Design a protein with these regions (language model features):
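Short alpha-helical elements
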Residues: 1-301
């Protein structure tokens, strides 16, 4: 649970960003001179809506309606004096999807340190028994398979550094190969050095393409593959790949990035983005201690 000082800090960051975002957005908008628009501002600002969405994932809440009515409206009324009804708040969620996405991408993501970890985690939208009658994500969610078996929903692809900070993320349907996001340059923007992954990312063409872009893909070897030499440092880093599994666990258990009660796709995106934003504000993140010793010894390849 965030303290009031932390909530104020998050609000100041979100409010400063929303003001700059609105200023830049108005410069490129085309004015509609045929019809008149009232342009009446909402009672709650975009920053307040973003903060309330983020706070939901910091306190272990599981029902957003109960959280908004029983916690925000009763215990945080001094921080949010211009509250709206729950139904109106759900409608306003859609309006902050774009600024919330850019806020995460431009402000909250970490910095690459040269050691990164990549992995994907499934986001179930319903039980497997209900796949054929599921209508909310019809045409969007797909069947996929992970280490835990078959599922129906989406995949969250994450890249983190050795400090547990999220460097980039991407949502795809459940049937997309884990290697597909790595083939897109935007997903690997500002990523350099070693990129540790599991056996699902093995691919000679992918390894060569990443190596030409300054990224060394480090994976284990499958049983039916010819063994290859690997440095001790790479072997140690592969043992620490559980770091990104811990990040996925915190997103699903401390935050609530995965549940099967979504009523629309926009609600799913708002919940997922706010969970990632809440994780970025966690003071304690899973991390590994990496120390480099300069022994002035040359390595012969």
């Amino acid at each position: 649970m965030f303290t009031e000082s932390k909530i104020t800090e998050i609000y100041c960051m979100a409010d400063d960003f929303c003001k700059e975002f609105s200023f830049q957005q108005e410069k490129y908008m085309i004015e509609d001179k045929k019809t008149g628009h009232r342009n009446k501002p909402n009672r709650m600002s975009d920053a307040e809506i973003m903060v309330i969405l983020i706070l939901f994932h910091s306190g272990g809440f599981r029902c957003f309606k109960h959280y908004y009515k029983e916690y925000v409206c009763k215990h945080l009324e001094h921080l949010f004096p211009h509250r709206v009804s729950y139904n109106r708040f759900v409608e306003l969620e859609k309006e902050v999807l774009l600024p919330l996405t850019i806020f995460i991408k431009k402000v909250l993501l970490g910095t690459c340190t040269g050691i990164s970890f990549v992995d994907s985690t499934p986001l179930h939208v319903c039980r497997n028994q209900r796949i054929l009658i599921h209508k909310t994500f019809e045409g969007l969610a797909e069947r996929g398979k992970c280490s835990m078996g078959w599922f129906f929903g989406f995949k969250l692809h994450l890249i983190i550094n050795d400090k547990g900070e999220i460097l980039n993320f991407m949502f795809t349907p459940g049937n997309v190969d884990d290697r597909e996001p790595l083939k897109q340059g935007k997903f690997l923007k500002n990523i350099k050095g070693k990129l540790c992954a599991d056996k699902g990312y093995i691919g000679q063409a992918l390894f060569e393409n990443l190596f030409l872009n300054g990224i060394q893909l480090v994976t284990k070897v499958k049983n039916n593959m010819r063994n290859s030499l690997m440095s001790i440092a790479d072997r140690i880093l592969l043992r620490k790949r559980a770091l990104i599994e811990t990040v996925n666990d915190e997103l699903k258990n401390i935050a609530q990035i995965e549940h099967s009660r979504h009523r629309s796709f926009s609600n799913f995106i708002a919940n997922s983005l706010s969970a990632i934003a809440a994780y970025c504000f966690f003071e304690k993140k899973p991390a590994i201690e990496v120390n480099f010793i300069n022994d002035r010894q040359l390595t012969i390849f």
